């Protein structure tokens, strides 16, 4: 009869412990009730990216002097710069410039070290395609100005600011 009493006491202790754990979880759940939702309805709502966001690279063909600094500072030697030396003026003439965003790691070194500021990072991050070869952007695709998320009237933008606790 003595082992039966200890089993009953252990069962009671386990029940109290389980009830306490469930109560702690319930209190955490109740503390999150008055907070704003974290998730967004993505295609219809988009977060406004920060100024330092590193999205698609924008390229200005007229500013580029074909110095190939972007290729040298890129950790994966990604930008492809084709140029021709003009012997009469002894300067390089840019023929083609392309970046494969399927390989790019968006580190921003090319933008940071460009001496003529012909490269810049945009807020555009929707680069998904069904064919990976479509991610190879030439100077025409890189020169396309990005569509601002704020200007798109079909999408509700949400400012991504940390909550200020009072």
Swiss-Prot record:
Subcellular location: Plastid, Chloroplast thylakoid membrane
Chain sites annotated for binding [4Fe-4S] cluster 2: 74, 104, 107, 110
Pfam families attached to this UniProt entry: Fer4 (PF00037)
Top-level division of the source organism's lineage: Eukaryota
Catalytic activity: a plastoquinone + NADH + (n+1) H(+)(in) = a plastoquinol + NAD(+) + n H(+)(out); a plastoquinone + NADPH + (n+1) H(+)(in) = a plastoquinol + NADP(+) + n H(+)(out)
GO molecular function, one term: 4 iron, 4 sulfur cluster binding
GO biological process, one term: photosynthesis, light reaction
Domain 4Fe-4S ferredoxin-type: 55-84, 95-124
Co-factor requirement: [4Fe-4S] cluster
Cofactor comment text: Binds 2 [4Fe-4S] clusters per subunit.
Keywords: 4Fe-4S, Chloroplast, Iron, Iron-sulfur, Membrane, Metal-binding, NAD, NADP, Plastid, Plastoquinone, Quinone, Repeat, Thylakoid, Translocase
Positions of [4Fe-4S] cluster 1 binding: 64, 67, 70, 114
Mode of membrane association: Peripheral membrane protein
Keyword Membrane: yes
PROSITE patterns reported for this sequence: 4FE4S_FER_1, 4FE4S_FER_2
EC number annotated for this UniProt entry: 7.1.1.-
GO cellular component, one term: chloroplast thylakoid membrane
Function: NDH shuttles electrons from NAD(P)H:plastoquinone, via FMN and iron-sulfur (Fe-S) centers, to quinones in the photosynthetic chain and possibly in a chloroplast respiratory chain. The immediate electron acceptor for the enzyme in this species is believed to be plastoquinone. Couples the redox reaction to proton translocation, and thus conserves the redox energy in a proton gradient.
Quaternary structure and partners: NDH is composed of at least 16 different subunits, 5 of which are encoded in the nucleus.
Record family assignment: Belongs to the complex I 23 kDa subunit family.
Protein name (record): NAD(P)H-quinone oxidoreductase subunit I, chloroplastic
Source species: Dimeresia howellii
Gene: ndhI
């Amino acid at each position: 009869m003595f082992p039966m009493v200890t089993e009953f006491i252990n069962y009671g202790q386990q029940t109290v412990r389980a009830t306490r754990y469930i109560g702690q979880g319930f209190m955490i759940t109740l503390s999150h009730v008055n907070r704003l939702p974290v998730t967004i309805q993505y295609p219809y709502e988009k977060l406004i990216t920060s100024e330092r966001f590193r999205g698609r690279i924008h390229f200005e063909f007229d500013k580029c002097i074909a110095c190939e600094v972007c290729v040298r500072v890129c950790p994966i030697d990604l930008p492809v710069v084709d140029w021709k030396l003009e012997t009469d003026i002894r300067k390089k003439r840019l023929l083609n410039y392309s970046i494969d965003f399927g390989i790019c790691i968006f580190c921003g070194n090319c933008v940071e070290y460009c001496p003529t500021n012909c490269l810049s990072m945009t807020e555009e991050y929707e680069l998904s395609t069904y064919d990976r070869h479509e991610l190879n952007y030439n100077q025409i695709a890189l020169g396309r100005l990005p569509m601002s998320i704020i200007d798109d009237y079909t999408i509700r933008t949400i400012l991504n600011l940390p909550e200020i606790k009072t």
